[in-house]
Structures are given as structure tokens and as C-alpha cells.
Amino acid sequence: MQEIKNIREFDEIIAHDKVLVYFYVPWNNSSLSVGEILEEEKDNLSEYEMVKVNLDRILSLTRIYHITTVPDIKIFERGKITKDILGIKTKNELFKELNK
């Protein structure tokens, strides 16, 4: 999964169709667990362009997108948030939320 390095790169990527953005911090165990689930399931999530954002490196995105909890998964389509998924702990929960 590609890691976004800066806001300019982030803005370019989310302008695409169906982008799954995984917001995390490396010191949070829940964040790391969800990251592992996404990596394991990437073939089953191939309809999405998947990227990750380390919020310790791009802290301003927490204000822009009102991120108060990690991990946070947002689905963007052409720059607009179409889904916000919080509190995922298992792959079943992830797919249930994605299929709503």
C-alpha cells in the first residue's frame, strides 16, 4: 500500500475514482492491526486504489478531515468522501462497512 508523503500528493490521489485512505499512527496497536488486515485483503479490495497516511507526518489532515480516532478509513471518489469507517477491528467488520 502506497504511503502518502505530503498534502499535495494526498490531494492528487483522492481526486481519483474509488480511493480507500487508511489514516493511522504507528504507535497505536489498533492502527497497525487494521493496516495488516488491509494488506492481507488487498486482492479482495482491488476495486479501490489503497493508500495510507501516517498522521504523525501529516498532522494537518486531522483538522481538515476531522479525524479524532485512529484507525480511520475514508473512501473518496473524485475528491469527495463517500464513506467514513471508524472502529474496525476485524476483516468481517471492514467488509460489512464497505458493503453498506
Describe the residue ranges of each PLM region.
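Acidic phosphotransfer microenvironment of two-component signaling modules
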Residues: R8-D11, L59, N92
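Local sequence-structure signature of Cys/Sec-based thiol-disulfide redox active-site neighborhoods
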Residues: E3, E9-E41
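Thiol-based oxidoreductase modules, predominantly thioredoxin-like and allied folds used
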Residues: E3-K5, F23, E39-K42, S46-S60
